[in-house]
Design a protein with these regions (language model features):
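N-terminal intrinsically disordered, cationic/polar leader segments
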Residues: 1-65, 72-74, 78-110, 114-116
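Flexible glycine-rich active-site/ligand-binding loops centered on an Asp-His dyad
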Residues: 118-126
Length: 126
């Protein structure tokens, strides 16, 4: 069985948190995109759709969470919060797709431009 490992290092003010997750994953290719499909610990389906310039992570929560990353460009995240659906700006500073690995570094900020946290996400599978 193929496994996916998602290791996210989050810098929030002076706090550093590392989230390390391992799931069974299914890999599919369709057109120019590759897809990683798995279920998280909440039993929500998660789909990561990616190619060289773009990655979209959709979590089928209720309502669903959508994060879009663009190489060298800002993009949007739609994240459900206790205050309802919130739109965040994602500033991606590093995005690299390897053979069985994706590296992402990004900042999340609200629409007013107030930074929320810094993230370094490493996704590996195989």
């Amino acid at each position: 069985l193929v496994k996916i490992r998602m290791r996210n290092t989050i810098q929030f003010d002076e706090q550093l948190e590392v989230i390390d997750q391992l799931y069974d994953v299914e890999l599919r290719e369709k057109g120019d995109f590759s897809y990683l499909l798995f279920y998280n610990e909440e039993q929500e389906k998660v789909v990561i759709k990616f190619q060289e310039e773009e990655l979209v992570m959709t979590r089928f929560s209720n309502p669903k969470t959508i994060m879009r990353f663009l190489k060298d460009s800002d993009s949007l995240a739609y994240i459900p919060t206790p205050m309802g659906m919130q739109e965040f700006i994602i500033q991606t500073s590093h995005y690299e797709v390897g053979e069985e690995k994706i590296e992402l570094a990004y900042k999340l900020q609200n629409k007013e431009g107030v930074p929320f946290a810094d993230y370094r996400l490493e996704i590996t599978w195989g």
